[in-house]
Amino acid sequence: MKRIGLFLLTNIAVLAVAMITMNLLGVGSYMQGTSLDLGNLFAFAAIIGFAGSFVSLAMSKWLAKMSVGAKVIKEPRNADEQWLVETVRRQAEKAGIGMPEVAIYEGAEPNAFATGMTKNSALVAVSTGLLRHMRQNEVEAVLGHEVAHIANGDMVTMALLQGVVNTFVIFFAKIVAYVVDRVVLKNESEGHSITFIVVDIVAQILFGILASMITMWFSRKREFHADNGGAYLAGKENMIAALQRLQTMQPGELPDQMAAFGISARPSNIGDLFRSHPPLEKRIEALRATTQDQLKVA
């Protein structure tokens, strides 16, 4: 129920921002009588596409805390929390970013994630399962991986890519709906018919599935960079050890908006093209093939 509420709130915010922005920019209707104004349509698609992506990014820390129940460590209550905060602080300084918020959330399975709108206003969260089942040097490497995601600007880059993808999904879906409605079925009434709306929804779903291959491909590439950064911040052998440990465990499930920035993910049921993370063995191989002077963060 909580996730449904968060989803509805996000969409209400997206629509509000989109409508206000379109009014400010003077973007009119993309339907001119029975014809399609491609310029206005593209502007409409871009505003909606980027608004959705960046509103989600802006709300990502709040959504993360709400969806997994992450508790930010404001004042460390024990030695473990003190170590977590100090480790992230040291890694953030080495990576040249502002100190992220550090949080812990209840989860039997091992995982961690990073989120936030900017490099200097981010969140790093770890599950209790990760702390329970991993050695300290392995946890340090996982934290380094997440700090590297922040330092590399992966959240903003992913939001930009998602905005571009959203734009083209909306744009081409409405063109397909227009062609089916006006050209194939020869509907000449003004405005959107039921056919247009149904075809538009179906086309957006289909194009969205195809477009997700692009975002997942990008996510897999960024994982190698985050592993590299984690090795730079916490040590190459520690990063390899953490990934090897994950090979023996079932990774925890994360909400969709954070899955791309977790340390690991469950395999996709529909093939590698839809995986947000490369197979762990490939990540380990890539690290082993990397020399010490190739380790870095952005």
UniProtKB/Swiss-Prot annotation:
Binds 1 zinc ion per subunit. GO terms for cellular component: plasma membrane. It is found in: Cell inner membrane. Its EC number is 3.4.24.-. This is Protease HtpX. Its cofactor is Zn(2+). Its main location: membrane. Pfam families: Peptidase_M48.
